[in-house]
Structure formats: structure tokens, C-alpha cells
From Swiss-Prot:
Compartments where found: Cell membrane
Organism name: Rattus norvegicus
Record GO cellular component, one term: cell periphery
Name the UniProt record assigns to this protein: PDCD10 and GCKIII kinases-associated protein 1
Reported function: Acts as a tumor suppressor. Acts as a tumor suppressor for colorectal cancer cell proliferation by targeting KEAP1/USP17/ELK1/CDK6 axis.
Pfam families tied to this protein: DUF4699
Gene it is expressed from: Pgcka1
UniProt keyword annotation of Phosphoprotein present: yes
Compositionally biased region (Low complexity): 58-69
């Protein structure tokens, strides 16, 4: 089985720390030997462990009971030289039970208890890694310590993700470099300042249309036209327009009633007169239109008077 297993057991006796093996289920972390177990350590190079025959198991290690009973140690008979020679052969292949020695030291220090059979535990190269991370280094020899120091630099380049899934940090950097960059749109946005500054007159066309509408004289806008939901400034503009329209209509009527204005000659038999309508916004235009209408009415009445005279004859 080799000296590493003995050193591991010795480290568990003096300073038990939860150090599971990567990729395996190890239940040896909570293992404690009772006083009746006879353990004899011989040297540091060729140490042996004597365990009573009642604790030997042919299968994997079992989980210790909650009452603190003894747990079988990974021992399958006496340690021979053939077993020690087979162990380096297994380590040269680099793969133990389908798991490569590329897992990191972080997974070795995870506190989750795991199980492992005695053969795979003995042939696993992670025993040296556990010993290097364990505080019981005075029991290590110079040769084993050099092997462990050579193994640690190969593990620093990888990191553990999840359970047994290792990824290199270079892959993460490569993925970060390939993130697609989305350029800014070249077309103007809906509410961008460029669109607002294109034509500021169109922006306020709604309010300008309300302010430019002028009501007819004498006709007050309805409540729906004034709008109960209109802002206060627009309501004031409606009131001012109504007042201006009424004053303008009164001034036009006063000018029409002036005696200096030429009056049409009307037939007493036909006293029909068209009411004057509001056809303009300025006083000069209204007066000119009234004069033209009066002349047209006079000519029409003269023609109708001649026809009436012919009918009388």
C-alpha cells in the first residue's frame, strides 16, 4: 500500500481535518480510533499499522455510526513489496478510476464527506496532495516532499467549477473577448433632441391651431369648444378672443348707422333688404363691401321698378 497511506492515517490520528479526495466519496474524515484499537507505528519509511481482525473489510469503507463506533481502515492484508511496486505503475498512467489529476486543491479542501475504496485510495496520486496541504508535515520525508512540490505547480493553472468540472481561466478570458459589440443606431430616435430641434413649429402645432381659431362674431363658443379639460392659458385666450370679437362687431354696426354713409334708394313696394354679414376682420374691408352691396341693390331695385311699371301699363 505504500507509506503514504500510513502517513495519512497517522495525520488523522494526531490532527484530524476534513480533507476529502477529489471526485471520490470519502468517509474517512470522521473516523476516530478508540482506545482498544492497537496501532503501532514503525519509523517513517517502512511504517505498518496493526488493526484487529474484526475491523477488516473486503469492500469499501463504511460510514461511522453516530455513537462514535470504530470504522474499518483501508487495509487488505499485510503490506508487501509487490503492492508498493504496483502503485507507481498506476500513477504513471495519470488516470485513476476515470479521473485525471487535473482537479485543483480547492476541491481537495471541500468539507463534503466522500467514500472511496481502499485500492483506488492507495493508488490515487492525491494522497501526496493531501499530505502537502496537511499540517502533519514533520512525518514526511525529503523524497516525498519533493514529489509533492512537483505536483502542485501543475494544478495551479486550473480552477474547479461545480463537482469535478475544471476549466482554465484562459477560456473565460477568450469568451469575454468574443462578446459581440452592438453599435449605436444611426437613425434618429423618436424622442431624441435631434428630432425635437428639426422643426419646433410642428411640435407645438396642436396649441397653435387652438390659438389661431377665431370664433364668429356674436356666437360664443360652446362648452365643448372651450373645453373643460383645456389648460387655464387656453381658456383665457378664448375669453380674450370673444371680447375682441364683440367690440369689433359693435364698432362696425355703429359705422353703418352713420348718416354720412350712402343709403340705397329702395322701392316702397319691395322693401326686402339683405342683412349685412361679417365678411372680414378689418374695418376698411367691411366698409368697401357694404358700398358695393348697396350699389348692386340699387341697380336691382331700379330694374325691378321698371318691370313693375310695364306690368301696370
Amino acid at each position: 500500500m505504500g507509506c503514504r497511506c500510513c502517513k495519512m492515517i497517522q495525520s488523522y490520528l494526531f490532527d484530524p481535518v476534513q480533507v476529502p479526495s477529489p471526485g471520490f466519496v470519502n468517509e474517512v474524515n470522521n473516523c476516530k480510533l478508540e482506545e482498544d484499537d492497537t496501532v503501532r507505528l514503525k519509523g517513517t519509511q517502512n511504517s505498518e499499522v496493526e488493526v484487529p481482525g474484526s475491523t477488516l473489510h473486503s469492500g469499501s469503507l463504511s460510514k461511522p455510526d453516530s455513537s462514535g463506533s470504530t470504522t474499518g481502515l483501508p487495509c487488505q492484508g499485510s503490506l508487501t513489496q509487490e503492492d508498493s511496486e504496483e502503485r507507481p505503475c498506476v500513477e504513471k498512467h495519470g488516470i485513476v478510476n476515470g479521473i485525471r489529476p487535473t482537479a485543483t486543491l480547492q476541491s481537495v479542501r471541500s468539507p463534503r464527506p466522500q467514500q472511496v475504496d481502499s485500492v483506488s485510495w492507495a493508488s490515487s496520486p492525491w494522497v501526496a496532495t493531501i499530505d502537502s496541504a496537511h499540517p502533519a508535515q514533520p512525518f514526511l520525508e525529503g523524497e516525498d516532499y519533493r514529489k509533492q512540490s512537483c505536483m502542485l505547480p501543475t494544478l495551479e493553472g486550473t480552477q474547479m467549477v461545480g463537482h469535478g468540472d475544471s476549466r482554465a481561466p484562459a477560456e473565460a478570458l477568450a469568451v469575454a473577448d468574443h462578446i459581440p459589440y452592438i453599435p449605436a443606431p444611426d437613425y434618429p430616435q423618436v424622442w431624441s433632441p435631434e428630432v425635437d430641434n428639426v422643426n419646433p413649429e410642428e411640435k407645438d402645432c396642436l396649441f397653435e391651431n387652438h390659438s389661431e381659431v377665431e370664433p364668429l362674431p356674436g356666437i360664443h363658443p360652446r362648452v365643448s369648444q372651450q373645453g373643460l379639460s383645456m389648460p387655464f392659458s387656453l381658456k383665457r385666450s378664448w375669453d380674450s378672443l370673444n371680447e375682441a370679437g364683440t367690440t369689433e362687431v359693435l364698432s362696425v354696426y355703429f359705422k353703418e348707422e352713420d348718416p354720412t354713409q350712402p343709403t340705397p334708394v329702395a322701392d316702397p313696394g319691395n322693401e326686402r333688404e339683405d342683412p349685412h354679414t361679417y365678411n372680414g376682420n378689418k374695418e376698411g374691408a367691411v366698409v368697401d363691401e357694404d358700398a358695393e352691396v348697396a350699389e348692386a341693390l340699387a341697380a336691382l331695385e331700379a330694374a325691378t321698378a321698371g318691370e313693375d311699371a310695364d306690368d301696370a301699363d
